[in-house]
Amino acid sequence: MIQPQTYLRVADNTGARELMCIRVLGGGKQRAATVGDIIIAVVKDATPNMPVKRSDIVRAVIVRTRKNVRRVNGTSIRFDENAAVIINKENNPRGTRVFGPVARELRDGNFTKIISLAPEVL
């Protein structure tokens, strides 16, 4: 459950290290984001000399959440951290690598490029 003011780790190699959610796209005013949802975020911490700088406004897709994600078959999955991957307007990742596992729910949102870059899909 990601809402505005939530801090997230960045799971790619764009140079950003930490994001803060400022808007959840889709839904109404009180909507919270979960795995596979797109957010607007600001970069709070970044590596020097990389394409993404501190205080940049970026689009990102949630790939891991600490809140349980219920699946249709009755199981649920939970991760140790909240993490996102920075994407462009066409929903393709801006980085060339994705770190850590990602949830299978990304397949429903047509984020197949992120799934193919991820080392593990849970």
UniProtKB/Swiss-Prot annotation:
The gene is rpl14. Keywords: Chloroplast, Plastid, Ribonucleoprotein, Ribosomal protein, RNA-binding, rRNA-binding. It comes from Chlorella vulgaris. NCBIfam families: rplN_bact. It comes from the Eukaryota. This is Large ribosomal subunit protein uL14c. The keyword Metal-binding does not apply. One of its GO terms (molecular function) is structural constituent of ribosome. Binds to 23S rRNA. CDD domains: Ribosomal_uL14 (cd00337).
